[in-house]
């Protein structure tokens, strides 16, 4: 007698695991919306649960507290920012070719433009990620500063190769330049959040480029 076929889920992750991941994702996205509209301090776990449309107690099946979900919210927000701002700039293929000063400046200018466009279209995101969330506690400050260090180190890698090839002057500290370029992206974003428009942004970028370009080019190229 043939044994009846047993019904099973087949390959892949168990349904419970998939449902858990889906619910966690929903809660993270809901917390992101709540934190960027109400502010982290004013928001509650009940607000997050209501945003998803679930009971208050269900939140605690997935996260222990409002602070516990914050790390995932920060990761979610940073992923959005980096994807929209950097694009494929930091992909391995983009890091392997020799960069020129003009290309570096174009990359920086493009990043500034995209950050300002985000500040126009989603000002709550920029306000939260740049100003509100970093001040919550030391642990979060360390994480965000660590990300800045990674980005600055990536720029340093670009610049070090350009120094070796003679494109960029060899008497500048490329690590410091990486941090300077990151810092220079903040003022136009703040101006945009305060209502500054395209003309103001373009003037800032042109001024920064006029200062940066001769300061980075090799002495031979400037002569």
What do the PLM-derived regions correspond to, one by one?
Residues 30, 34, 51, 58, ...:
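Amphipathic alpha-helical interface segments
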Residues 1-11, 113-117, 121, 153, ...:
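C-terminal peripheral helix-coil segments that are non-catalytic and often amphipathic
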Residues 79, 83, 118, 128, ...:
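Amphipathic alpha-helical packing segments from all-alpha helical-bundle domains
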Residues 127-130, 167, 171, 193:
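Short, hydrophobic secondary-structure boundary micro-motifs
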